[in-house]
């Protein structure tokens, strides 16, 4: 697979490199802002789960470029420096992280909190949706510590069967909750974004990061709040048909554009968690072991079977399925 193949398959990936963005997700925030004017009047913004930093880039240009704007980026992983962005390598479920954010804002709360984080997907949709919901609630919890009344919160969601419960939890804290799908987000993906405006916590609510909103046993106060348990919110598409289709392949020479020239990524990730696996695959040393005892027991397996010695099947890297991880050389 050549270097240009992904440029053909993913036009937003290609445009991100050509425009100096660290990732294609920058277009998602730009399209959300075009629809909802997220940056209007914003001088202090927080980017949670910020690495590799494309949303922080957008915030820096839209807010920090005004001279009086301040942007704080938070992530567990290291991130290459960005001009006009204060970086915190920390855990969003820790109170110390919230205090450090406020400290950088000189005691003032933030106008906008965004979160484009997502867990490593497993392919089990129920598990992925649950993990994403818990990550969003953790982001919401830290937002309640740093967001000013009337502020805005934008976070990635997976539109599963239980997303209506998530909407009801968000509406407890915000006067307006919408589900938005940017044009640069693939139609084949269940990804969308919760756009929550008008932060207005319940009377008497005291944020507490010792209870990270991850389960009813952790935070009984949050789960005892009154209100509907499931609601339906408006669904908004960001961008019209004149925008590029994120699910379509495009020729290298785009209509009305200059002659194609390959552009390397703007900023490769720093010490990504998959780095070791990529190194092993390049050397042909990546293997996947499948043992009978690791497989789920089917109904047929419950009947008596002749005893046989356990076997270990090894699939070398060239034999891996198409949906396994692929790393460019």
UniProtKB/Swiss-Prot annotation:
Query: Has UniProt tagged this entry with the keyword Zinc?
Result: no
Q: Which UniProt keywords apply?
A: Cytoplasm, Disease variant, Intellectual disability, Methyltransferase, Nucleus, Phosphoprotein, S-adenosyl-L-methionine, Transferase, tRNA processing
Where it mainly occurs, coarsely classed, is cytoplasm
InterPro entries, sorted: RNA_methyltr_E_TRM7, RNA_methyltr_RlmE, RNA_MeTrfase_FtsJ_dom, rRNA-MeTfrase_E, SAM-dependent_MTases_sf
Q: How is its activity regulated?
A: Inhibited by 2,6-diaminopurine (DAP); inhibition promotes UGA stop-codon readthrough during translation by misincorporation of tRNA(Trp) in the nascent polypeptide.
One Pfam family name from the record? Answer: FtsJ
Please give one Gene Ontology molecular function term for this protein: tRNA (cytidine(32)/guanosine(34)-2'-O)-methyltransferase activity
Subcellular compartments: Cytoplasm; Nucleus
Q: Which disease is it linked to?
A: Intellectual developmental disorder, X-linked 9: A disorder characterized by significantly below average general intellectual functioning associated with impairments in adaptive behavior and manifested during the developmental period. Intellectual deficiency is the only primary symptom of non-syndromic X-linked forms, while syndromic forms present with associated physical, neurological and/or psychiatric manifestations.
Q: How is this protein organized at the quaternary level? A: Interacts with WDR6; the interaction is direct, and required for 2'-O-methylation of position 34 in substrate tRNAs.
Q: What is this protein called?
A: tRNA (cytidine(32)/guanosine(34)-2'-O)-methyltransferase
The beginning of the lineage is: Eukaryota, Metazoa, Chordata, Craniata, Vertebrata
């Amino acid at each position: 697979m050549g270097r240009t193949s992904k440029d053909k398959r993913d036009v937003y990936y290609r445009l991100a490199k050509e425009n100096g963005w660290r990732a294609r997700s920058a277009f998602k925030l730009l399209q959300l802002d075009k629809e909802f004017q997220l940056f209007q009047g914003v001088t202090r913004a927080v980017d949670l789960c910020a690495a590799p930093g494309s949303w922080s880039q957008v915030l820096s240009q839209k807010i920090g470029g005004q001279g009086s704007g301040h942007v704080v980026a938070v992530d567990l992983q290291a991130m290459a420096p960005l001009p006009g962005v204060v970086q915190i390598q920390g855990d969003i479920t820790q109170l110390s992280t919230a205090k450090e954010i406020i400290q950088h804002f000189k005691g003032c709360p933030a106008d906008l909190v965004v979160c484009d984080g997502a867990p490593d997907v497993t392919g089990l949709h129920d598990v992925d949706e649950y993990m994403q919901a818990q990550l969003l609630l953790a982001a919401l919890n830290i937002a309640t510590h740093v967001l000013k009344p009337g502020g805005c919160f934008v976070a990635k969601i997976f539109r599963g069967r239980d997303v209506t419960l998530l909407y009801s939890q968000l509406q407890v804290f915000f006067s307006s909750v919408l589900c938005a799908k940017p044009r640069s987000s693939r139609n084949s993906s269940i990804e969308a974004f919760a756009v929550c405006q008008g932060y207005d916590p319940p009377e008497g609510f005291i944020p507490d990061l010792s209870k990270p909103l991850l389960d009813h046993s952790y935070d009984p106060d949050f789960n005892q709040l009154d209100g509907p348990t499931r609601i339906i919110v408006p669904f908004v598409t960001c961008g019209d048909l004149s925008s590029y289709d994120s699910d379509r392949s495009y020729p290298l020479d785009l209509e009305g554009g200059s002659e194609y020239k390959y552009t390397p990524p703007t900023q490769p990730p720093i010490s990504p968690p998959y780095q070791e696996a990529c190194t092993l695959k390049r050397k042909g040393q990546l293997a996947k072991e499948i043992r009978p005892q690791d497989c789920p027991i089917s109904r047929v397996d419950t009947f008596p079977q002749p005893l046989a010695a356990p076997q270990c099947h090894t699939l070398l890297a060239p034999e891996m399925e198409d949906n396994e991880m692929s790393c460019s050389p």
